[in-house]
Amino acid sequence: HFITRLLGEVGIWFRFTTDTRLNIDVVEFYDSQQGYEKGLTLPSVPPSGQHSKAVDSVWGMECHHNVVQKQVSTRDYNYRQATQDMNTLVDATRGDVTTYGDAYHWADNYLTPGSAHDRNPAPESGAFYARIRHERYLNGQTRAQGITSCPTLSPGQVLKVTGGYEVADVFAQGVVITAMRTYARRDKDFAVDFDGIPDSTDFGFRPEPGARPVMAGTLPARVTSTTENDTYGHIDKDGRYRVNMLFDRDNWETGFESLWVRQSRPYAGDTWGLHLPLLAGTEVAIGFEDGNPDRPYIA
């Protein structure tokens, strides 16, 4: 879950393949439509008795449509550039009239807003996270389901279905396989239930990142320094400290037990404020913004 959450937060999906040359399993990571495997086309033929003419086919096709958000707005605060405008707004559909509403997300933890007009915004910028979120919403706009007898079907493939009026345009133009369930037994033929989304040039598959761990309350720690018995506070230019979490049993180089951690202060501004430096050994309580373990601060 930890790996899939981190990858899902930045829109990366993966699949397992086999290297026939080295006879090993391989994990492939992708973040765009370039990772799709294309070229699989199957006919729409419902099963009839025990005779399939030795041809793999697709049947039981369904499409479900939902109204999703028209655009995504994000905002964050970067104390390093406190006056910078961190608002971004992205519409990945390029004007789809069937979408509606604005999804607003606060504190995706980015440092720069990025360009909302760039289809490939700077990684981990506000526009980047807004586009990832909107593409994830668009993944739920059209959901495709079906059953096939093809044993080589795998997630990440683009399946096209040929046939008559029973084949919806979504299947005729191509469906990206996002999930599948394979089953077979003695009294029933081999079959694969699959889920998918339309193969679109406007957006790609974006996995759900899953729930993030929540750090409730505070944790005890002590301020550290690279100098033993330091008489001054060991801080950086932004007034941040390094701390030693008291629950941590690993051994670290003195003064490098953590990344720089910001201290919350009762009075602070652009060019004014009050900061009483903490000396090495001072006990502090570590809190977490919105319970996010990636955003600790000295309470």
List the model feature ranges, each with a label.
Residues H1-A299:
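Amphipathic alpha-helical and helix-coil boundary elements used as assembly
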